[in-house]
Amino acid sequence: VQPDIPYKKLNPSNSMEVNKGFKRLRGDVTEGRRLTFEAHNRALSHNGSKLKSSSSSKEHDEKDQLFVVHWQGVNPKDNRFRIATTDQLYVTKSLSLSKNEEKAALFSLKDMGNGVGYSISELDSGKRLQLNEDGSVALGGDTYFQIYRVTL
């Protein structure tokens, strides 16, 4: 006896639906998703000209806290990304934002495993992105970020 096919209620009008919401990221980061980067009950955010932080939101969907990563590798395991806002402003080495993609810094986003979180390193300097409990953002720390993928 064969069980019923679980998706038989799908039709062309609802076959491409996605569920709105968020989910904590696990494993390797992939490009093309809206992401939030959070630590210490704060989230990386942007004000149009620089990277900053603000209080984490319950649904992880505040527009100024959403980012998209763009893979810059050659081989599948290359961990090289540009980080941009959803308005295509790129994070630079000075943690400012630029419309010029060529000024974007390259970052490595490494899953530390076992739910610890992700380390985010700027590749030229080797310094890790830091989000302090006071909300300040800098390079040169040891913050582990929880990353959430968000569907609006």
Predicted regions located by residue number:
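Lectin-like carbohydrate-binding module/patch detector with strong preference for beta-trefoil
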Residues: Q2-L152
